[in-house]
Amino acid sequence: MSILSYTFFQNALLGSLLASILCGLIGTYIVARRLVFISGGITQASVGGIGIGVYLGFSPILSAAAFSVLSACGIQWFSHRRDMREDSAIAIFWTLGMSIGIICSFLAPGFTPELSSYLFGNILTVTPSDLYLLGTLALIAIVVFTCFLRPLVSMAFDAEFARSQRLPVITVEYLMMDFIALTIVACLRMVGIVLVISLLTIPQVTANIFTHSFKRMALLSIVTGYSGCLGGLYLSYHYNIPSGASIIFVSILIYLVCKGISWSIPRWKRQ
């Protein structure tokens, strides 16, 4: 029987596509705004939400989403204060989330196997509820980036110019930080906390080899991201190795191949 006939593998393929679309769009904004470190801080802070969910006995995804959104808003708020640097704010929420997660998982009654699944992920365990979450966020991202692409690009590359055009920069920054937090949480089941930031950066860095256009970079990120997911699934199935690590490994291989190809392409053709 073909592996494609199994429901869990069909869910993995659909989840990969939805995650590639979502991460392709949001990740392009992250890379353009140079928010990779902040996104990494939010990712690690989500451990606190997962630990709270495990300890209280309800969905770790919901608690991680709430905790990550609050952490994102907290980092954004502290980053705009003159008495605290951005990297210091990230470190505070990063370590706060990790400490809360460790304490809650230690105090949780019984064995907590769910915690390790969120740390390392397994795309083959993606559930229909995970697909609904990914699909909803991907649809919202498509609508937002289609309708508000020019303002988002303006704010991503030159926030001061955007302010001079009377664009609501602060409001949009908070909303995008919350969107980043939800995107991270939605992808935890696929690759886990340890590797989720890679889905939001490696395809974008690969796309950036060939173009500096925000729109083309987002589209190429979706293609390279999905290619990495498919290749990772293939390796995971045939060699019985963790799917999350396989996806990231293949994504990095794609980056290296594209980097090699770019050396033979004149710079003016990549603009």
Residue ranges and their predicted role:
Residues 1-21, 270:
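Membrane-interfacial amphipathic/re-entrant helices at transmembrane-helix boundaries
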Residues 6-11, 82, 90-150, 178:
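Transmembrane helix-bundle core of multi-pass membrane transporters
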Residues 13-18, 61-66, 91-92, 131-136, ...:
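Hydrophobic alpha-helical transmembrane segments
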Residues 15-24, 45, 49, 53, ...:
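Alpha-helical transmembrane segments in multi-pass membrane proteins
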Residues 28-111, 207-219, 236-239, 263-264:
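Short loop segments and helix-boundary regions at transmembrane helix junctions
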Residues 130-203:
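Helix-loop-helix "hairpin" substructures at the membrane interface of multi-pass membrane proteins
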Residues 190, 194-245:
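Transmembrane alpha-helical segments in multi-pass inner-membrane proteins
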Residues 241-248, 252-271:
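Cytosolic-side transmembrane-helix boundaries in multi-pass membrane proteins
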